[in-house]
From Swiss-Prot:
One of its GO terms (cellular component) is HslUV protease complex. It is found in: Cytoplasm. It comes from the Bacteria. ATPase subunit of a proteasome-like degradation complex; this subunit has chaperone activity. The binding of ATP and its subsequent hydrolysis by HslU are essential for unfolding of protein substrates subsequently hydrolyzed by HslV. HslU recognizes the N-terminal part of its protein substrates and unfolds these before they are guided to HslV for hydrolysis. Keywords: ATP-binding, Chaperone, Cytoplasm, Nucleotide-binding. Belongs to the ClpX chaperone family. HslU subfamily. ATP binds at I19, G61, V62, G63, K64, T65, E66, D277, E341, R413. This is ATP-dependent protease ATPase subunit HslU.
Length: 463
């Protein structure tokens, strides 16, 4: 957990990945810092302070989801993104709103489990190596030293059998020590061994996914799994691959699942972030039965956001201190079209601005994961170094902005389409090109994109 970041530090970290949108960054930075402040309070006061949920308003592709996702990743908090349109009112077929909390707890369990695995990794690898030694130098089957039933009664011929067993054990121990040394030196990595691994069974309850009955299916499956034996199967693998599988198995045995569950539920309750996208799609004045159903979804979401207890396979989870970040474009509706009770549960409103040509230029080159850096790295694997002139980057940004204006505005996602079209031929022929360095010029951009961008009808289908 990295809750110690100051709001300014959080904004600086977000700047590494997201261009612009200062208001949204400030809002999430303050929300995160308030969690740290709350953790320092006395318990009686801490229970009274709930997080202030955020409503982000802005067109698609301007960074709403990315701001929330990077925020959660920054502090290592459990985070899930859900779409409001996927939920249905209680009583209808579909996912119920409580499933978002169950998904959050599952994410939290995975995060805590991964952390625990890292802690026991060394011990698990040591035990896996021990198992590999036993597989490579197996113990001989112990045979009874008595050939005649009467010998068992009178103790005959036992001494000679014990002596030979002791000698055999000594030889095996020497062999195992030799194999241990070779394993440690990495000399047996390509040796093939036969190991028994637990078989991953596909569940018949998978068909319940997305029907709103998945929780019932999981509970029933867990109940069956507790008394059904686990299936194992033999696999032939190299020592290197076998070590990975055995280390994972040993790590799972070393982890205390009760401790994992307890910590995961705590993190989900106190640090969890749920991002509800497309919330504008369930807003609207009552005019027909569809709108009534949308309002039903809003009313179902309300108690979750207000604070309630949700039953999960890991126990009851309180939603009082989960941070909810809702987002929507609100093209066809307004935030005031949400039911008043739900509006009141999102006190912080942030409007994200449309992206300009200058923003597109920055998106192409400035972030740590900038698009141009990605394409340069991909083509470098073929031995080709590509570079973009400043004028070419400006040209790409102008075309992306223009196509957004002429067709649907999909924000920064337009750059992915533009870049793919621009480098399509180069990516196709990269393995056959003998040139080591290629410079992308404004003329090249013009040649590949301008004719399509100028023709509105064509750009609707291609860009």
């Amino acid at each position: 957990m990295h809750l110690h970041f100051t709001p300014r530090q959080i904004v600086e970290k977000l700047d590494q990945y997201i261009i612009g949108q200062k208001d949204a960054k400030k809002a999430v930075a303050v929300a995160l810092r308030n969690r740290y402040r709350r953790s320092k309070l006395a318990e009686n006061l801490r229970d009274e302070i709930a997080p202030k949920n955020i409503l982000m308003i802005g067109p698609t592709g301007v960074g709403k989801t990315e701001v929330a996702r990077r925020m959660a990743k920054l502090v290592g908090a459990p985070f899930i993104k859900v779409e409001a349109t996927k939920f249905t009112e209680v009583g209808y077929v579909g996912r119920d709103v409580e499933s978002m909390v169950r998904d959050l707890v599952e994410t939290s369990v995975r995060i805590v489990k991964e952390e625990m695995v890292v802690k026991v990794q060394d011990k698990a690898e040591e035990q896996a190596n021990q198992r590999l030694v036993e597989i490579l130098v197996p113990s001989p089957e112990k045979q009874s030293g008595f050939k005649n039933p009467l010998e068992m009664l009178f103790g005959g011929a036992q001494n000679s059998s014990q002596t030979s067993d002791t000698q055999e054990d000594g030889e095996i121990e020497k062999k195992r020590q030799d194999v241990e040394r070779k394993l440690a030196a990495g000399l047996l990595e390509d040796e093939i061994v036969s190991i028994e691994v637990t078989e991953q069974q596909s569940s018949m309850f998978d068909m319940l996914q997305g029907t709103g009955m998945e929780q019932m299916g999981m509970n029933f499956q867990d109940a069956l799994g507790s008394f059904m034996p686990k299936k194992t199967k033999k696999r032939k693998l190299s020592v290197k691959e076998a070590r990975k599988l055995l280390t994972n198995e040993e790590a799972q045995r070393l982890i205390d699942m009760d401790e994992v569950t307890q910590e995961a539920v705590y993190r989900a309750e106190q640090l969890g972030i749920i991002f509800i996208d497309e919330i504008d799609k369930i807003a609207g004045k009552q005019s027909n039965s569809v709108d009534v159903s949308r309002e039903g979804v809003q009313r179902d979401i309300l108690p979750i956001v207000e604070g309630s207890n949700v039953a999960t396979k890991y126990g009851s989870v309180k939603t009082d201190y989960i941070l909810f970040v809702a987002a929507g474009a609100f093209h066809m509706s307004k935030p005031s079209d949400l039911i008043p009770e739900l509006q009141g549960r999102f006190p912080i409103r942030v409007e994200l601005t449309k992206l300009s040509t200058d923003d597109f230029v920055k998106i192409l080159i400035e972030p740590d994961n900038a698009l141009i850096k990605q394409y340069m790295a991909l083509l470098a694997t073929e031995g080709i170094e590509i570079e973009f002139s400043d004028e070419a980057i400006r040209k790409i940004a102008e075309i992306a902005y223009q196509v957004n204006q002429d067709t649907d505005n999909i924000g920064a996602r337009r750059l992915h389409t533009i870049m793919e079209k621009l480098l399509e031929d180069l990516s196709f022929e990269a393995s056959e090109i003998t040139l080591e360095k290629i410079t992308i010029t404004p003329q090249y951009v013009e040649e590949k994109l301008a004719s399509i961008a100028k023709n509105k009808d064509v750009s609707q289908f291609i860009l």
